[in-house]
């Protein structure tokens, strides 16, 4: 399980920027992770344990992601 805060950044008429909380979108999340890894020169694969904690998408579609490495939780077993 992981938590995601996703925001859309838009420019206002007065030149300021506004962040609006957006709906969770798994496909966009994974694309943001892959792009983050590409820019860092690292490959992203199924063994990654890095989850996006916050990402911002600007009006041009650019995605900014803040990431933190975490260990995945052990799967729960049913008794």
Stretch-by-stretch model annotation:
Residues 1-21, 50:
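Short aromatic-glycine-(Arg/Gly/Cys) micro-motifs in beta-strand/loop hairpins
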Residues 4-5, 9, 26, 38, ...:
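Intrinsically disordered, low-complexity regions enriched in small/polar residues
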Residues 9-11, 27-29, 59-60:
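Generic structural motif
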Residues 16-17, 25-51:
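A short, charged, amphipathic alpha-helix used as a generic interaction element across diverse proteins
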Residues 21, 41-79:
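Short, mixed-charge low-complexity intrinsically disordered segments
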């Amino acid at each position: 399980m992981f938590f995601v805060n996703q925001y859309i950044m838009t420019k206002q008429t007065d030149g300021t920027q506004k962040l609006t909380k957006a709906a969770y979108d798994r496909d966009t999340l994974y694309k943001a992770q892959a792009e983050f890894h590409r820019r860092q020169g690292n490959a992203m694969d199924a063994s990654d344990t890095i989850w996006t904690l916050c990402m911002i998408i600007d009006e041009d579609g650019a995605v900014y992601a803040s990431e933190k490495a975490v260990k995945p939780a052990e799967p729960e077993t049913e008794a």
